[in-house]
Amino acid sequence: MSLLGGCLNRKSRKKRGMVLALLLIFCSVFLCGEKEAGYASQNAGMTDIRVGLSALYGGKTQIKISNTKIGLGYCIKDSYQTDLEFASSTGFVFTPAAGYYYSLAKTYSSYANAERVAAVIRNLGVSALPVAIYRNYWRVYVGGTATAGQAEQIYAKIKDRFGYSYSVLMPDNGHRVLVRADRYEFLIDGEKKKAYPQFKALDLDGKGNAVLDLGERRYRGRIEIGCFGKNSVTAVNIINIESYLYGVVPCEMQANYHSEALKVQAVCARSFALMKVGYSADSNISRAYYLEDTTKSQVYRGYGAEDSRTNRAVDATRGEAVYYGGKMVPTYYFSTSGGSTENVSEVWGMGADYLKAVPDLYETEPEKKPWLVSYTRSELEKKLSANKLSVGTVRAVIPQVMTATGRVYLLKIRGSSGNSILQAGTIREVFSLPSTKFKVVKQGDVPDTVTALGGWGAETIRIGESYMLSAQGSVTKADTELSQYIVAGADNLMNYPQNAPESADNWYFYGMGYGHGVGMSQSGANGMAKAGYGYREIISYYYSGATVGRAGT
């Protein structure tokens, strides 16, 4: 019998020791203590993408680029060029430029020309600044006042001077940014051409790399800072996808994992990003980004997170993505399965033949150990209320429907004023659980029981009172001081909690796994790599029937 399908049979000699060990523990017990599409690429020649830096630089009152030399330019039809260089010994501070302005009717082809005119107007004792509108397109704005009346007072001082004509009064448009350097300032107005400029580092770090320094984090590529319709500033990193992956792979998978597992992560992260955003670098004020640097997309911490081991994995798989049926596909992944991955239909309700549940028995060193989460009655009620699911006083917590892999698909909460049924991913979100592979234990339950079949028929026994044969062949008594027992079956793992709460006001959630369970298990991929599988084989296993190919071909 093949535990992992035909893929494993091809490696039978190399893996025999591992498979035999798994079979030995078919009913042996291990003791464990407490402890998500957009559009695909249409232009394979252009590999810059846009990543929203929402984790640290989204919706801020100000963002500072600490570099002393930066270049300003616009990306038009996926082609960027630096139009102007700026220097500042104190770096560059970007803030929203809300307020009322008048604009000179005349346009200017350079910052220098616009600044000369602005300087003349400033001699009248008013605020006048050059404004970046687009490539070779500058204006001069006067004002920046909190009220229209204040702006009109300024206009009264300048309207008959120097022969300049002005626009009508312009209120805040949600797209203006003020940039302050050590001895000068200028404005950016993204609304006129529906685009913001992008900035690149012109000074080099100690390793000779041009890296933009935003304080807590540094980034390769370019940075775009805009308001995007809000009274705050947000940074977007425009970066080559391979350089982006340098900052993703070590954040999504431990850099000390096997090199083949790191390659799996690199290919999957590349596929995920390309399916989410395609190749697109141009500014778009109506949608700053589709991909961000958090778990909502993929965790990305930029240049400072890079590791030589994960960089090598990215380089070794350069340009490769996951394909199914001749098309690039989204590659979902997660930390730990707890014995088996899950069908995508059981998690998000959609169908995808390559995202089927598969046994994950090489996940022998899980990144996330089996876990226990305890809630009091009042804590459960607060969680429900915070998600607008109030049921009054909680009476019972009942896993109502289980998937074939042992995950809770429907969880019923029975309360004094009604019932609420939570489904799949909502369960994790509401109760902050690592996964949906769990058992609920209440006062009075005898959780560590299992039914064994013998010569005298079925018998219910307590695991804590049993002796077990380990994978090494030794016989030991169960350790009763640990929180739950993990039993390895032919194609999954099962958990048996040891203890029940002493109070009727408590519920224990005993579980395994970490993440949604769809696609590739990172811990399992590492186990398969250690057992001798290559990254292409691992990908084809977790994404059933999928292959690795060159993006854009």
Residue ranges and their predicted role:
Residues 2-553:
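Conserved, single-site charged/polar hotspot
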